[in-house]
Amino acid sequence: MDFLFVQFHSTIKLNFKTHHGSFFYYVKEYRCMSKEKLEFVEPVDTNTDNEYSREPVPLGARKSCFSLTIVWTGFVFLVTSMMAGGGLAAGLTFNELLLAMILGNIFLCIIAGLVSVIAYKTGLTFALLTRYSFGQEGSRIASLFVPIVNLGWYTIQAALYGHFIAQVFNLSYTGEVIAMMLSAVIMGIFAVLGIKSLAVFGYIAIPSIVFLSLGTAARSVQTIGGWQELFNYVPLQPIDLLSGITIVIGTWILSTATCIADIMRYGKSKKDVITASTIGLLGGNTLMISCGAIAGVAMNDGDLINVLLSFGLVFPSLLLLTTNIFTTNGANLYSTSLNLANSFKLNRNMMLAVLIAISALATMTQPYKIDSLFVFLSTLGIIVPPLCGIILADFYLVHRGKYIDYHKATFKKWNLVPWITWAIALVCVKFIPFGLPSLNGIVSGALLYALITYIVKPNVVSESKG
C-alpha cells in the first residue's frame, strides 16, 4: 500500500492506493504531528463513480431537503398514477376518492419515512442495506430483484414515449423503432450524470408538470359543467373505500419500499428525509391521482396526455409526457444501477452503459404490447415487497434502530433466515384473502423475520477490531 501525504491548511489528505482503487482519507492536523494525534474522518471515494454505489454517502456530499424533494417528487410524477386516478373515478364518488387518496398516501408516507430514515442514518443504497440481513454474498442475489423490475418498467416507458413520438409525427415503423431506442438512451443520460442532474432536471420539469396537470384538470371541470357537477358525480360501477385505498397504495408501494433509499441516503437530517418523502407522496402523488380522477369523470379518460390531445393541444401533451416520463425514468435507472453495482463487480458507469444498451435493444420488441411481460413484472412486484419488510424489521426490531458503521462492519457471507422468511411470506401473501399483495408482503416479511431471528439468532454482522 502506497501512502501520499498532501497538506491542506488545517487538514492532511492521505491517498491510499490499493488494488481496489484510490481512496482519500481526511485527517485533522494538530500542532503535535504524532500518529496518536491523527483523527480519521469519513472516507471519500475518488474513483470515477461519484455516486457512492459501494460505500456510505459522506456528510460532505449530502444534499439539501429541497434538492431531495425535487428528485423524489420528480420520481413520483408518473402517467400511471393519473390513470389510476381515472380508474378510481369509475368506482368512487369524488368525496370517497379524496378520502382514499389521503389515507392511501399517508400509509405510503409511513413506509417511505421508515426506509428513508434508515438510508439517512447509514448513507447506504438499498442494495448495501441488504448486507446487514442477507450477508455479504446473499446480498448480491437479494438485490437483483429490484433492478429487474425497474429495468423492465424503464424499457416499457421508454418504448411508450418513442411510440407516442411516432404517433404525433406520423413516423414509419423504422422511425418508431429509432424513436424508442433514442428514448432509452437519452433518458439514461440523466442516470449517468447522477443525483445532481436529476435535481436540475426536476427544477425545470416539476413546475411544467404541475402547471399542465392543474390546467388540464381545470379545463376538464369546465367541460363537465363546474365543481358542483364533479362532487355530484355518481359512479356506474361502485367499489368499496378499502379497495380504493388499496389502489392508491399500489401506485407507489414498490418504490417507497425500496428505491427511495437510493435518494434519501443523501439526506442531512431525519427531518429532511421525512419532509422530502412526505411532500413527494402527499403532494406529488395526490396531484397526479386527483387530476387523473377529474379527467376521468369529465372526459371518461384518466390519462391527461390523451385529454390534452382531445383538446387539440399537441405540444402541451408532448411537454407533459416528456417531463413526466423523463423525471421518473432517470431516477428509475439510477436506482437500478446502484442495486446492480452491489451484485456485479462493475463500475457504476460501466453498468449503466450496459443497462442502456440492453434497454435500447429491448425497445425494438415493442414491449408495451407484450401482455406476458406485464404479468412477469407484476409478479415480481409481489415478490419484492417482503424484502422491504425484512430490511425494516432488521433495522428497527433486530438492531434497535442502529447498525454497526459500514466501514467497521464484518459480514457473514450468507444468512438463511431472510430467505426462509421470504419464502414463507410469499406463501402468506398467496393465501391472505384480503388487502394488497405488496402490502401484505411487507407486513408478513417484517413480522416473520423478527420472529425467526429472535429464535435462531444468526449474528450476521459484527464490528471489526482495530
Regions found by a protein language model. Name each.
Residues M33-N95, I239-I247, R265-D272, V456-G466:
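Membrane-interface "cap" regions at the ends of multi-pass membrane proteins
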Residues G86-G91, S116-V117, L160-N170, S183-A205, ...:
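Membrane-water interface regions at transmembrane-helix termini and the short interhelical loops
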Residues G87-S116, G138-R140, L281-L282, S444:
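Extracellular loop-to-transmembrane helix junctions
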Residues I178-S183, M187-Q222, S277-L281, F376-C388, ...:
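Membrane-interface loop-to-helix entry segments
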